[in-house]
Structures are given as structure tokens and as C-alpha cells.
């Protein structure tokens, strides 16, 4: 009665309780809690608080305060007005328990199961997927800052784990050198001084790593996480040679560094990776969001059905099978799945319809640069004789070389090359190849894959295909809502698994926001159009 008096028109929390009832059963989370000790806070309530926390982009302290102070939250949680709530650290412990027992997906799954019962979400419809970058919860560091901060982080960790050993071993001056965080503001500006500082930090790091495995050090010291990170970073960033007892240290060159997928970018988040996409670089992760998009046909709201979180270097095509597997397990596998070109591959176009009865809709990339520029002879200008294993050019010449193997992405590919003496005298050579030493080269997929690529390239030029694919762009609005409402752009936590849990909570929160808008008749926002673009110049 008090909540009704305070919110006569209702609010999100009250409408969720009225429409969905108790969402999260305590029994689902039972394995994450012990059977002895003091009674704890009901895990179902903690799950609901965690979702509301992300729906309103609150900190743990703010969420715990809302449980104590807000009538609408008490209504949703089924608490008495006099309930004192709980300490904010309980939320941290709850997330840790979810991760420790592999229950991080359950919160979104339980909501989807309830919505499935209410026929608000179902499989075999149309869904769409897109990804966005996630910034790690660490500051950006240049190379010198990075190695200095990595050594400082290791010393900080050992100062807590083995203070007596570190105090007895640590050389003089290290407290002043590594006591404060490494920052460009405090680093020397002179290049020669920066170089000397780099070699000093490198030498100090090697000295510490040798001492950590020495006789006087605790046997377990190398197992400290920060010490292991220091060892890995020094291996990745430096190369050391010892000649006649003299140690020489140098940076690893660009070609000597490990690939981005293996290279640590921060001592405080070893799962974070660096990636570059369309000229934009970031350290962190990537999240793939899948949502329903058949509202016009069903009258149902657009709801997120699955999220996948990876490090920043994982390519989009890699996650498609996982998305389909998880959606199938939930009974939410779509009949049509819209994706951008980054996800599309010949293998996917072949296997998704045959193995899962899913029609994947997305553009296939142009075959060659000449296709994009619409000049010269592209691959479509050549005919392929699969039985004779050769290609025939527009002038009627036959290729000489046919090599089967893998492309740079480890996918099956066939490389076809024309002989130099065949192409050299050809009057159309300038329209065919820029090479002055070799004949024209083609790279094609195996016959079945090549056929499906040609079919899709023809389909994507039709107005019908374009109208269906245009629906895909709406998922970018979902990403925008997750970023603005829940602060998804920068992760709150360090580590891949904690970040993935945050994205599950975000997806669940966005679904509640979407449901509330649907219940209250709030229409979808139209595409933004500037006043200038909207002018009718013909008037």
C-alpha cells in the first residue's frame, strides 16, 4: 500500500514485480552457498539487486543503500519497510560465488525462461548480432610506464605476501624508486635519461625475479600472480644476453614481440588485450550482443537473448558457433540471423542452414580491390574449370598453377596463377594485374564455398535482401542503450570472467528496461535526422 501511494502510476521495479513475479529462485544458486554458518541474504534477491544495480548504473554502495532506502526496490524484493538491508560487500561476494561455481549465465537464462513462458520471447524468429569494444578498467600506459608499473605491482604484492623477506632483501633506493605509481608526469623528459631509466628498470626486474626463486625466498613466492605477470612481461618486452658475466638488455623489436592475442597490456588486468579496428586502438575486450528483432511480425519487444565476451583480439567469426550453440540450448535458436560482414564466412553460410536450419543474412565482402573500384577484371571475369583444376581469363588463356592450402586466417583456399609468359604480351594486362614480374593470381574457396559466396553476392544486390538486412542496424541502438544506461563502454572489473558476468547483468538489465518501455507503451525512438537533412529542397 505504501509503494502504491508513493508511485500511483507505478515504476519499473513495481511493474517487474507485478508482471513477472519472483524472478530468481534461491534454489538455482544453492550450489554456490554453504549449508553451515549464519543465514545469509537470499541469493535470488542478490541476483535481482545486481540486475537493478546495472539498470541504474549504480556502485555496490549505492545499490546496497537503495535496498535500505527505496520503497520501490523493497516492493520488488519483497522486503518489509523496516528491513535494514545488507552491507555492500555482500554483492562482491555474491559475484565471486557465481564465478566460482559457473553460474554467471543463470541470471539472464532465468529471465529468458520466464519470458518464454509468457510468450514474450521464442525461438525460430529473427535475431541480430553485433559487437562493440570494451575498455579495460585500467589506465593506458606507454611502454616505459608499463614495465615500470609491472615491476612496482609485483613489489606491492610481495610486500603484502612476504613483507619480512622483501624488507631484508630489497636493495636501497627501491622504496623511493617504486613507492609511487609510475607516471609520465614523473618520468624524465630527456631521451637519454629515459633510456637509462628503462635499462635500470629492466635490470631491477631481472634481479628481483632471480631473487624470487633464490634459496632465501619463500618457496611459494613464484606462484604469486603479480610475480608471474612480471616474469611474462619481461619475457615479452625485453631480450637479455650475458657475455663474460656482463648483462646486456634491449627492447624487443616490433617483429620480435608476441602477437597481440598473447601480449599482456596491464599488470592489473592480465586478460586485457590490445586490438585495432578501423584505425581505432583499445586495450580491453569485446562483447557480442544478440537480440530479437521481429517486433513488427510478433508485436513483442526487442530483447537480448545472449551475450558473449572475448578479449579484444578475437575475431567476430569465431564466436558465431558458440552463439548458435547457446541459443539452441535455451530453445531460442533463430530462423533468420542478421549479422554484418565481419561475422560472415563461406563456412558459416554453408553449415548454418544445413546443420542448424538457420538462415544467416549478411553481406559478403567484395572479391578483390578491382571489384570495389569497378575497374579491370575481377574474379567474376574469370571462369573456373573445377574438374580440370584451372581458370580461364577473359582473353581465353588458361592458368598454369593450382595450389590448395590455407589462407592467412587458416581457412581452406585455392591459389591460382597464370604463367608470366602468358600475361606479359596480353594487351589487357593493365586491366588485370599490377605485377610486372608475375602473371595474374586468383584466390578462390573450394567449389561448394565458392558457389555459396557467388549466390549471396548476387542476392545482396536485390532490393528484397537489402530491406531485410536493413533491420540489422537496429542492434546498434541496443549497444547504445547498454553503454549509456549501464556504462558498458568501460568495464567495472578486471579479468575476462568478471567482465563477462557484468555483461550478463547488463543484458538482463537492458531487457527489464525494454520490457518496462513496452508495458508503458513507449514507442521505439526513430532514427535521428538533422533539421538540415529533413528540409524538403524540392518545395
Language-model segment annotations:
Residues 23-27, 70, 74, 485:
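A short secondary-structure junction motif
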Residues 1-35:
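Basic, low-complexity segments
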Residues 5, 9, 38-41, 278-279:
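Short secondary-structure boundary/capping segments within folded domains
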Residues 62, 83-84, 92-539:
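Anion-binding and metal-coordination hotspots
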Residues 31-123:
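Basic, low-complexity intrinsically disordered segments
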